[in-house]
Amino acid sequence: MKKLFLACLMLLGAIQSWATGQEADIIYLYGEKWMLLGRPLDNVRDVKARLSLALPEARTKSTANPDGIVCIWSVQGTHLQLDSVAVIVGENKLTYPALGLKDPFDKYINKDHISASWVNGQLRAARGKQLYYEHTGYNRNYASEIFLTFKNGKMTDMKTFNNNVRTEGFDLTNGKVMQALQDGMDTKEYSELKGSSVLARISDMDINKSGELKDCKVRIIMRKNGYSTELTNHPLEKRVKNALKNLSPWRTLYINGNVIIPHSTFTFPITVE
């Protein structure tokens, strides 16, 4: 029965989809506290399942933290180790030294610590002002970020980035943008659109250093009688582009060595009159 329960826990973890922003773990890098935007324990699901059984069943869980577990890690020298595990029970935060939870981590005990020797690849740590956020997974960025590369738990590379806002302004989720697009769309002259619903799909936005839109890709999709049709080279494409170009400046960010445009892909409905 216990094996079956462990298997169920592993399966639930495997099919979990991050449909909301996820709570970060914590990592100490040479004494400094950072958010760890990832969950190294997800790569050892048998360990994670046993850990779940070893912790209080009444711990608080949420869509942002379905397991109700926050792990505290550190890099000692060049080696990643798991120091402790924290949970919330009622109004109390309980922290358990990882070494005291011997059963889940028996394969990774190295003298006086838990060696995260299963960790391979890249982890991202962050702190400071949040510059960008999407309500899914760890799709967010901060003023300071570090990319750590590991091989069998040993750090082989570390890259540090200082991020900032390049231009402040609009993005496609802004209500004023939505209103400007609706105001700029006169559909009365397009008889082929009557009785249908129409969507404009915007992507590939090209914005210059001043925050002005140079170009973008617009697709017009008409749905009528249960069928969807892309209207190639429809005049509405140009109208949407012009409406967007009349808005300035657009918000752009300098993130981890690249210029990005927040929410640069978006679909919005066009009201058909």
Where would I find each of the regions flagged by the language model?
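Short tight loops/turns at secondary-structure junctions
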Residues: 196-226
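Start-of-domain marker
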Residues: 18-83, 87
